């Protein structure tokens, strides 16, 4: 189908943009559903199912908890002096020594996990007048009775248990972590059999702190053949400070100290397989890529990870507004520029030209405007990732039953943070999408205005993204318009002449329509006059009588 007004002396040039048959729906600030030619998913919703051991050093706890490894449970001796970035605790971990409790378990676990090491230094504590290295059949080390390797169970020597008063200064330039404990016998008889005194006492102090523990004698549920318990405590001694231990019984003494380090190490509960692979981000479900700014896999993370959000999907537009082409038009059909719809099949650019002239029809992309849009869009994903991904980890939180209110508050804070990030993510993506669409629309308008300024009075804006060129414009001429070298002065006289001729024809065609309407109106008027005259004549002759009743 030829374009209106197109012959050898004129041409038509349309500007358009890329379109696809089925676009992607995204959200903007002004519209919840707008179709674009291309978009990328911003939310990571799945993990690899395995924990990668690179670049982070992963220590598999296997059947040991971190605290059991710290104390020196016989079946955890393999972890002595180990280091890690992430300690992975398994659900099948168990204790296999004398039953114990840690009143401040969560704090100790977190402290040791963040230190990233079980490096232990033995010190020469002097325990005079007592028996050292006590053991239990609940804590077998091989065939013999044993005990936690990092602790020293002190009992009576003969029939005496003297008051112990031991000091240990910290002359180093780092913090030292001392682990110690108090034994709670199950009966009074067991108390006197082990420590002579009917009631013991343990006091551990530094210049900054002091703890005094009185044993609670009484039977408890049997665990590994024992109804007694050991309570584990810990003390940090700063450089220049002194550790003082005073006791008259029931002391589970330290054998030395753990060297504390500061760092980004952590701990995570997971049953995911540890494999040889590379991933910066780890969750209990397994490692996940961090090439997206958001994730919906797990709230608990370690490493450089996407932010956790509630949404399962957030689409970032990386293409322009999509207006699918009407397929019934052919190449030009009834002339469709960018104002009416987009063009499919533009594989070499986002913006371009279609023309029809004496040499036929053609299409070409405008690489300059395409590149301008792409350059501004390409960095969007990286910029969003930079705003959201950080070198941080979200650790698990544990609280004892008596800290229930603190746990509720912590959960509320975490849920609020997730709500805020989910909202921020929604707004951030909507803003970026709005900017992308406005940007691509702007580049189309810039190209159209640039073409209009070149053609000037040599062409007429047809109102739909096309120009009618009023001079002969072969393919070389069309190319000069596309590349910006068109000289309108060269074609001005020809264009003016052709414009007057074409407008004149259109004007004459318009006069015919006016004449027809005027003739029709005059004919109707004359018919009415004749009819009225006949009625008046008939009334005068008496052939027609007209009665008017009031």
UniProtKB/Swiss-Prot annotation:
Residues 536-550 are cytoplasmic. Palmitoylated. In natural infection, inactive HA is matured into HA1 and HA2 outside the cell by one or more trypsin-like, arginine-specific endoprotease secreted by the bronchial epithelial cells. One identified protease that may be involved in this process is secreted in lungs by club cells. This is Hemagglutinin. Belongs to the influenza viruses hemagglutinin family. Major glycoprotein, comprises over 80% of the envelope proteins present in virus particle. Keywords: Clathrin- and caveolin-independent endocytosis of virus by host, Clathrin-mediated endocytosis of virus by host, Disulfide bond, Fusion of virus membrane with host endosomal membrane, Fusion of virus membrane with host membrane, Glycoprotein, Hemagglutinin, Host cell membrane, Host membrane, Host-virus interaction, Lipoprotein, Membrane, Palmitate, Transmembrane, Transmembrane helix, Viral attachment to host cell, Viral envelope protein, Viral penetration into host cytoplasm, Virion, Virus endocytosis by host, Virus entry into host cell. Disulfide bonds join 14-466, 52-277, 64-76, 97-139, 281-305, 473-477. It is found in: Virion membrane; Host apical cell membrane. Binds to sialic acid-containing receptors on the cell surface, bringing about the attachment of the virus particle to the cell. This attachment induces virion internalization either through clathrin-dependent endocytosis or through clathrin- and caveolin-independent pathway. Plays a major role in the determination of host range restriction and virulence. Class I viral fusion protein. Responsible for penetration of the virus into the cell cytoplasm by mediating the fusion of the membrane of the endocytosed virus particle with the endosomal membrane. Homotrimer of disulfide-linked HA1-HA2. The gene is HA. One of its GO terms (biological process) is clathrin-dependent endocytosis of virus by host cell. The record marks 329-330 as: Cleavage.
């Amino acid at each position: 189908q030829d374009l209106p007004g197109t012959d050898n002396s004129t041409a038509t040039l349309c500007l358009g943009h890329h379109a696809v048959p089925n676009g992607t729906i995204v959200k903007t600030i002004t519209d919840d559903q707008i179709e674009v030619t291309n978009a990328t998913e911003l939310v990571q919703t799945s993990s690899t199912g395995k924990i990668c051991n690179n670049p982070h050093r992963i220590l598999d706890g296997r059947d040991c908890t971190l605290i059991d490894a710290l104390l020196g449970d016989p079946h955890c001796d393999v972890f002595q002096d180990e280091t890690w970035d992430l300690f992975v605790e398994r659900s099948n971990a168990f204790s296999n020594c004398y039953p114990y409790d840690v009143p401040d378990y969560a704090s100790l676990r977190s402290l040791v996990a963040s230190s990233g090491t079980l490096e232990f230094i033995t010190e020469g504590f002097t325990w005079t007048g007592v028996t050292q290295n006590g053991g239990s059949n609940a804590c077998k080390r091989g065939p013999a009775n044993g005990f936690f390797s990092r602790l020293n169970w002190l009992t009576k020597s003969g029939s005496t248990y003297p008051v112990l008063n031991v000091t240990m200064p910290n002359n180093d330039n780092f913090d030292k972590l001392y682990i110690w404990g108090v034994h709670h016998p199950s009966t009074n008889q067991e108390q006197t059999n082990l420590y002579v005194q009917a009631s013991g006492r343990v006091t551990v102090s530094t210049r900054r702190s002091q703890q005094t523990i009185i044993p609670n004698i009484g039977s408890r549920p049997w665990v590994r053949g024992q109804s007694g318990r050991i309570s584990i405590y810990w003390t940090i001694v700063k450089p220049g400070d002194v550790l003082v231990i005073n006791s008259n019984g029931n002391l589970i003494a330290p054998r030395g100290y753990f060297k504390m380090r500061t760092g980004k190490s952590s701990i995570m509960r997971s049953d995911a397989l540890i494999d040889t692979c590379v991933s910066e981000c780890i969750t209990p479900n397994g490692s996940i890529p961090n090439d997206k700014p958001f994730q919906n896999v797990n709230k608990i993370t370690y490493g450089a990870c996407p932010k956790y959000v509630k949404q399962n999907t957030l689409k970032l537009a990386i293409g322009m507004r999509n207006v699918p082409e009407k397929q019934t038009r052919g190449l030009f059909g009834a002339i469709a520029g960018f104002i009416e719809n987009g063009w499919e099949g533009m594989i070499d650019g986002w913006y371009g030209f279609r023309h029809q002239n004496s040499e036929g029809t053609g299409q070409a992309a405008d690489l300059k405007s395409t590149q301008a849009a792409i350059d501004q869009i390409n960095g969007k994903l990286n910029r969003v990732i930079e705003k959201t991904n950080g070198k941080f980890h979200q650790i698990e939180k544990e609280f004892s039953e008596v800290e229930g209110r603190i746990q509720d508050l912590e959960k509320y804070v975490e849920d609020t943070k997730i709500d805020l990030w989910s909202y921020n993510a929604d707004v951030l993506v909507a803003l970026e999408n709005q900017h992308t669409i406005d940007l691509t629309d702007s580049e189309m308008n810039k190209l159209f205005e640039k073409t209009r300024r070149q053609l000037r009075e040599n062409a007429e804006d047809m109102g739909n993204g096309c120009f009618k060129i009023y001079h002969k414009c072969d393919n070389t001429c069309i190319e000069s318009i596309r590349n910006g070298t068109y000289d309108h002065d060269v074609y001005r006289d020809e264009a003016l002449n052709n414009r007057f001729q074409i407008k004149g024809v259109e004007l004459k065609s318009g006069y015919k329509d006016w004449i027809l309407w005027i003739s029709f109106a005059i004919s109707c008027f004359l018919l009415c006059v004749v009819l009225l005259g006949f009625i008046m004549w008939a009334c005068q002759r008496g052939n027609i009588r007209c009665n008017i009743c009031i």
